[in-house]
Amino acid sequence: MSTTWFVGADWLAEHIDDPEIQIIDARMASPGQEDRNVAQEYLNGHIPGAVFFDIEALSDHTSPLPHMLPRPETFAVAMRELGVNQDKHLIVYDEGNLFSAPRAWWMLRTFGVEKVSILGGELAGWQRDDLLLEEGAVELPEGEFNAAFNPEAVVKVTDVLLASHENTAQIIDARPATRFNAEVDEPRPGLRRGHIPGALNVPWTELVREGELKTTDELDAIFFGRGVSYDKPIIVSCGSGVTAAVVLLALATLDVPNVKLYDGAWSEWGARADLPVEPEK
């Protein structure tokens, strides 16, 4: 990879006027935060020059599932309208917890962008360094973006069912342990408790510290401690396909090959009574 996974706030502040740099604000409300107006939060203050990458709006609205990838041409049109150029170095951030920036990073990579980095420390780190924010929308000329979709990046429910039944790939679930273990209800209504049979639980929050991934040694210890093997194909899942990207990013930084994301995630699996669930009632 020609770009670093993360860039620092000091580096971005120094290069913020570089014409080859574009900044993308990918903050997002999590389930249970429906009262948040994230678009207004962006307008109230964002890193100068950053356009708003609305993951909710950039999902496939023809699907009943919350965050399925849009069609490549739909994504390309949206990026051109934002002024995003696929040949530039895109810097993505969220509000500070590394919740949604990895999903934006993964989407851009899956649609063919080669140079994408995440701002280490995110917006919170930028503000801790007393760096300036800008208010209002950012209007850019139409971007040049032709989506080149990578079908190897994502799997469907049938692939996951086969992996679960035949043990052809490891399934990593990024949800909190209480949800994985069926101890609490899902935040989205109508979903069963539990997890995909055979899945391993690696909560995404355990991989993150202050808007950045933990060290390589710490990540290795977490994955190995949960029974993950880097030598076997991996499918990452979560509640709706967002925080699974945190796990995918962590594995990418460790040079783990053959990792794919299950876009339907528990929003799909947990809604279907015909699919098996652990623990069984």
Roles of regions detected by a PLM:
Residues 1-281:
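Cytosolic catalytic domains that perform sulfur/thiol-centered chemistry
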